[in-house]
């Protein structure tokens, strides 16, 4: 079976590998296609696409937009036009908000005796500074044992260095993806702790605004949950997608292509996704 992975993060957001490393890794894993779905940015796609030329590996343009619906919600977008002006303007606003939040985080850390500057972090980590980078700093200063420990103790919602972010409404996320010629998909539906009834309400709400798909296979979902999501996708006439949600060493127990061993997304799902392209 030809396998694919439609949920991957690079250093353009909170992943720990470059787009070129992702392509090399995907080829080692024998994948037929991957999607670069960085958080709130499309900056990682072109380098991955270029690296894959002549290798036979398909690279799908994608994004993962953060929003909220009775709590956190993520919307994936596939086959978006990366040059869409409306999308680019909205993403620029998200970048500006992230910089403001990062500067506030640095200021909080400075008050607690950490000697660092945001400018130095951008030199070290690149223009996209995120949660794993702050976690790495906390580990280096001896405040945490590892990155996951730092995030759970200091950077999660309600913790010492957490700064709330501005979020787009879910209907706006879907609209942006559709207007950019893309296919909107609810990411990892069971991560939001919905009961079955609430999940159905979420799907119906998003479908009313143009939702086209459901991520049915994900590293954090059990076999039973993944089977149920496939039934829901069929019931609602939604396209199925799936992926590992790979972040590299940021999430060391998740492997590209298979997640924790159970993801295994068939190429036929990508073929169905392609049918929805504008």
Question: What do the PLM-derived regions correspond to, one by one?
Answer:
Residues 1-72, 155-156, 168, 172-251:
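An N-terminally biased module of ancient metal coordination in phosphate/nucleic-acid-related enzymes
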Residues 237-243, 248-274:
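C-terminal active-site subregion of NodB/CE4 polysaccharide deacetylases
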């Amino acid at each position: 079976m030809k396998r694919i992975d439609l949920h991957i993060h690079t250093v353009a957001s909170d992943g720990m590998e470059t787009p070129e490393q992702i392509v090399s890794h995907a080829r080692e894993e024998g994948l037929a296609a991957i999607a670069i779905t960085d958080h709130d940015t499309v900056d990682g796609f072109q380098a991955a696409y270029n690296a894959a030329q002549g290798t036979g590996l398909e690279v799908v343009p994608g994004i993962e937009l953060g929003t909220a619906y009775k709590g956190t919600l993520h919307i994936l977008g596939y086959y978006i036009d990366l040059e869409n002006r409306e999308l680019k303007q909205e993403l620029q606003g998200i970048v500006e908000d992230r910089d403001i939040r990062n500067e506030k985080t640095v200021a909080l850390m400075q008050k607690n005796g950490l000697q660092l500057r945001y400018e130095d972090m951008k030199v070290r980590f690149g223009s996209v500074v995120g949660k794993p980078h702050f976690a790495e700093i906390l580990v280096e200063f001896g405040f945490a044992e590892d990155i996951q420990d730092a995030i759970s103790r200091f950077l999660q919602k309600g913790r010492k260095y957490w700064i709330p972010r501005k979020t787009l409404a879910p209907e706006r996320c879907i609209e942006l993806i559709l207007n950019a010629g893309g296919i909107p998909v609810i990411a990892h539906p069971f991560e939001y702790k919905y009961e079955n009834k609430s999940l159905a309400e979420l799907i119906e709400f998003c479908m009313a605004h143009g939702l086209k798909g459901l991520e049915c296979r994900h590293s954090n979902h059990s076999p039973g949950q993944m089977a149920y999501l496939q039934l829901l996708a069929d019931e609602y006439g939604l396209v199925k997608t799936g992926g590992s949600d790979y972040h590299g060493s940021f999430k060391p127990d998740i492997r590209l292509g298979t997640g924790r061993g159970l993801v295994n997304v068939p190429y036929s799902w990508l073929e169905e996704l392609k049918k929805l392209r504008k």
